[in-house]
Amino acid sequence: MTGLRGYESGVVTNETHAQVMRQATARRATLPALLTDAGYQTRAMGKMHFDLVRACYGFESMTLPIDYLRSCEKQGQRPKTHGAMECELVPALSTVDTRDSINTWIVDGSIDFLETRAPLRPFFLWTSFTKPHPPFDPCRDFWEIYDGIPMPEAVYGDWSRDLDAAPQGFLAGSYENTDVHLYSPQQLANTRRAYYAMITQVDYALGRLFACLRENGLDKNTWVIFTSDHGEMLGDHHMSQKNLFFEGSAHVPCLIMPPRGRGLPVNRRVDTLAELSDVYATILGIAGVTPPENTHGVDLREPYEERTFYGNSLDVNFCVMDGGYKLVYSACGDHTLLFDMVNDPMEQHDLAALPAYQEKRRELFRMLLEHTAKTRPQALENGYFRTSPAPSRPGDVGFRWLGFHYHDFNYDVFH
């Protein structure tokens, strides 16, 4: 939304963005504000996770998951609760058919916008699906697609396979929200089946959206960018959810489809690292809008060199990637892991304690510490990360009660 990384804007949790977003909107520096001011018809459809809920932050119009509930209630058809918690990974089939599901409602609204938009203005449509996000409650017809199909097994490393010996600071967030570390192989397979089913429903929904573009002749003048805010650990290394810089959580898709018929390059895979701030720069580049001076994203349509990546989540989990190596650090427990991402892309072999890699570990840790001192000094104390004790076992972490599915959350996330 702002072209800034979390540690640059100060948004390192879900609860810290309201003031930042208001200030950016006042400066007309949010992505939708810049596009609106450039003459675009801007529309948000689906999950936005904004605070305040109805704050548009530059969008001309916005329809949210809470509006799905309002529509259902007007028809006397509010979806029933199925007992799965907000962050639950144990599958629970949706209580509504696909045609009545929220993802279908979101793509229906997006198609409606394309068919009724202002014909003399360019448009920017942000379609944001709520799934796949816990609780894992796919619609039955998509769940059944994967009946009898073997699921990929969870990934474990030499540092994580033994749960008791694993660096517990990295696991604390998973303990707080799920009990995935107790799942049997069959339970993990069912969880992955549900995740695949929800992804497949998104795929079908996007097929309808792209068909609408073609039917209305918009595919010849529309760029499509598909990406996500985070992934899902899905039991890898005994972990769940997000907030971590391991591949399952942080490595998300970024697909760019150019307008058809212009002879632009297609079907290319680029292995150089990209980040979400680049999406901001890319969209503004497509629109011919100059990005604000304090943003650092690159236009992904153009060749660019590999960069050093720094990450901060919750002022607890940190990461630096440079030259094919990734160092991840947890201030909870003061844990450090080092991976060779070229030869070990699944992060199964920790190099941090090996004598041959001590210089690389010290170099990357120094880079991370110096970068944090410049960009997020409140995460440090006396020149070092502000640490906290790690749990010694799963039972040391209290389990959060996050509410039943279809509860109306403060930020209208409607998981």
Regions found by a protein language model. Name each.
Residues 342:
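Residues forming the ATP-binding cleft of Hanks-type serine/threonine protein kinase domains
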Residues 339:
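Conserved histidine-centered catalytic loops in small-molecule metabolism enzymes
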Residues 1-330, 336, 345-366, 395-415:
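Formylglycine-dependent sulfatase
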Residues 355-391:
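A contiguous, mid-protein "functional segment" used to position or interact
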